[in-house]
C-alpha cells in the first residue's frame, strides 16, 4: 500500500516556496506583485496543510506551525500592500523569513513523527522542501518576465542553479537506508515489482537533465528563450515531484 502524508508535503512546499521567495526578492529587483503572488499561493498551501493534518492525522506542532505560516504570509502580504498604497515601493524582505522559520518548526515535528532514522527523516523533509520550493518558484519567476520584461535573467539563473544544487542532496537523501535501493532489491515492496523504484530514478535523472537544458536555453539572447525555459520548468516540476513524492510514498507504506 502506498501512503503519503499530504499535510507534511503541503507544508514542505509552502516553507520551501517562501524561502526562495525571500531568496529572489531580497535585493528588491523584482516587482512587488511577484511577492504578492507567491505569498498568496503559499498561504493557501499552508492553510491546506493545516486542514489536511486536522482532517487526516494530527501532529499538533505541525498543524500549529502551518497555521503560523498562514499568518506569516498574510502579514507579509498586508504589509506590502499597505506600503504600496502609501507610495512606498520597497518591502522589507526579512518578513518573508518569518513564515519560513515558523514552518521549519513544523517540519521538524513532521520528520520526527514519520519515524525511522531521525537524521535521515529530517534530511528528506528539508531537502524536499527546498527542492519543491526552488523548482516551483523558478517556474513562477519565468512567468513573471511577461509582467516585468526588463528583469535581469540572472535572477532566474540563480533559481535554476538552486534546483541543481539541491538535486544531489535530494537524491542522496532518498537513497539512504531505508531508501530507494531497498525498492530495487525487493526489500521494500512497492506493489509493482520494483517498477516505482525505476520510475523514481527516471524522474531524478530527467529533472537534472531539464535543469541543464533550461540553463542552456537561458544563454540564448532572444526574449523567447525565457519562455522556453519556463516551459521546461513546467516539466521539471512534474519530474521533481516524482523524485520527491514517489520515493516517500513507497517508503512510508
Annotate each PLM feature.
Residues 2-86, 91-111, 125-144, 161-184, ...:
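Hydrophobic cores of alpha-helical transmembrane segments in multi-pass integral membrane proteins
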Residues 144, 148-153, 183-190:
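Membrane-interface interhelical connector segments
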Residues 157:
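Basic (Lys/Arg-enriched) interaction patch that binds polyanionic ligands
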Residues 115, 120, 187-199:
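Membrane-interface segments at transmembrane helix junctions and kinks
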Amino acid at each position: 500500500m502506498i501512503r503519503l502524508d499530504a499535510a507534511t508535503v503541503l507544508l514542505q512546499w509552502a516553507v520551501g516556496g517562501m524561502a526562495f521567495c525571500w531568496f529572489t526578492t531580497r535585493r528588491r529587483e523584482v516587482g512587488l506583485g511577484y511577492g504578492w503572488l507567491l505569498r498568496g499561493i503559499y498561504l493557501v498551501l499552508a492553510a491546506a496543510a493545516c486542514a489536511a493534518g486536522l482532517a487526516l492525522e494530527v501532529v499538533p506542532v505541525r498543524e500549529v506551525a502551518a497555521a503560523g505560516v498562514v499568518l506569516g504570509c498574510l502579514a507579509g502580504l498586508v504589509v506590502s500592500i499597505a506600503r504600496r498604497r502609501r507610495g512606498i515601493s520597497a518591502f522589507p524582505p526579512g518578513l518573508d523569513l518569518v513564515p519560513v522559520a515558523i514552518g521549519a518548526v513544523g517540519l521538524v515535528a513532521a520528520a520526527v513523527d514519520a519515524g525511522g532514522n531521525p537524521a535521515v527523516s529530517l534530511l528528506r523533509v528539508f531537502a524536499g522542501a527546498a527542492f519543491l520550493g526552488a523548482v516551483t518558484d523558478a517556474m513562477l519567476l519565468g512567468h513573471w518576465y511577461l509582467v516585468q520584461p526588463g528583469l535581469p535573467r540572472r535572477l532566474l539563473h540563480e533559481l535554476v542553479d538552486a534546483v541543481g544544487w539541491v538535486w544531489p542532496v535530494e537524491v542522496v537523501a532518498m537513497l539512504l537506508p531505508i531508501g530507494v535501493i531497498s525498492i530495487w532489491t525487493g526489500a521494500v515492496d512497492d506493489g509493482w515489482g520494483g517498477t516505482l523504484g525505476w520510475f523514481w530514478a527516471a524522474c531524478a535523472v530527467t529533472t537534472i537533465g531539464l535543469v541543464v537544458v533550461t540553463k542552456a536555453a537561458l544563454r540564448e539572447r532572444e526574449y523567447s528563450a525565457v519562455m522556453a525555459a519556463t516551459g521546461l520548468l513546467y516539466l521539471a516540476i512534474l519530474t521533481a515531484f516524482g523524485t520527491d513524492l514517489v520515493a516517500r510514498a513507497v517508503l512510508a507504506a
